[in-house]
Amino acid sequence: MIVPVDETNLLQAATIHSISWKESHRAFCTPDFIETHTPDRQREYLRNKMNNGTKLYMLVEEKPIGVVSVTKGLIEDLYILPDMQNMGYGTKLLLYAVGQCTDTPTLWILENNINAERL
């Protein structure tokens, strides 16, 4: 099930974002910089995006496992918990996000994110 993110589940979304962000950036960011991306910091990051008109969604199966943000046609912040990747959840969340776009969908990914390129 995919649900909108609001204040009631923002910390859950931020925790997913934090864990997944750290894992995806570990190869090219310093350990000190990685560790600054705590759930509290990511909650503020996501809250600011929401306050500026971005819609956030969270994929919940038996537990919350993924997040994505949509701003008009821009899809960003697509993160799936590391132990839940390569099971189709990223594709499911991406397809949902495309359906939420009000402009031509564009997926923003890091240039070295090979897993995201496969989507």
Model-inferred region functions:
Residues M87, T91-K92, N112-L119:
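Conserved active-site alpha-helix within GNAT-family acetyltransferase domains
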